[in-house]
């Protein structure tokens, strides 16, 4: 985005993309975070002008302090962009997704849905770990969720993982 943001936004808009998502940005120092916020704000404005949404996808690092500040909190307070909240990484980072929804209603139209083991070291199929999905999905309207994406980073058996996740979510959402 720093180098070719306008080109990316135009290509996304021309291709009919509804959301452009930034998957990561430098956050090693506070200066990195501030520079990232500037780029994210410019990208958000360009996306609005192009008629598409813009969101930021988190990992757990955004919830760790950088020089006394939490990058994710800075993103929420210093930008107007929307968020693609990775619910497992937020949980690993010590943030309660439902509390984020309450504090920033409507800012989370996109979710990444996966699960974590008790030690928060291994990704699991949805429903087999510690992420409180029933509670989180009950707060979907507060979050502004429009789409969610089930993922599992590097599963041993992708078909078994997605089948388990689908079964859990189907049962939970139909209850």
Where do the model's predicted regions map?
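C-terminal helical cap(s) of enzyme catalytic domains, especially alpha/beta-barrels
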Residues: 157-175
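Conserved residues at the C-terminal ends of beta-strands
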Residues: 23, 114, 151
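H/E-rich (His + Asp/Glu) clusters that bind or coordinate divalent metals
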Residues: 128-137, 143-150
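Active-site acidic/histidine proton-transfer and metal-coordination neighborhood
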Residues: 1-83, 159
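A short, acidic, flexible beta-alpha connecting loop/helix-capping segment that sits on the rim
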Residues: 149-158
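Short, acidic/polar
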Residues: 1-12, 68, 93-102, 133-136
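Short acidic/polar active-site loop segments enriched in Thr and Asp
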Residues: 17-19, 109, 146
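Acidic/histidine-rich catalytic cores of soluble enzymes
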Residues: 49-130
């Amino acid at each position: 985005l720093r180098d070719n943001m306008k080109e990316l936004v135009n290509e996304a808009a021309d291709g009919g993309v509804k959301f452009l998502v930034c998957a990561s940005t430098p956050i090693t120092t506070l200066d990195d975070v501030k520079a990232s916020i500037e780029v994210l704000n410019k990208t958000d404005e360009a996306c609005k002008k192009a008629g598409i949404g813009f969101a930021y996808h988190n990992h757990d690092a955004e919830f760790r302090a950088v020089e006394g500040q939490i990058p994710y909190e800075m993103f929420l307070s210093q930008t107007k962009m929307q968020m693609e909240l990775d619910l497992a990484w937020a949980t690993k980072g010590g943030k309660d997704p439902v509390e984020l929804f309450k504090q920033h209603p409507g800012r989370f139209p996109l979710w990444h849905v996966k699960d974590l083991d008790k030690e928060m070291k291994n990704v699991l199929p949805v429903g087999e770990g510690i992420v409180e999905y029933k509670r989180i999905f009950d707060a979907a309207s507060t979050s502004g969720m429009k789409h969610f994406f089930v993922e599992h980073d590097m599963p041993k058996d992708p078909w078994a993982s997605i089948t388990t996740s689908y079964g859990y979510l189907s049962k939970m959402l139909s209850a």
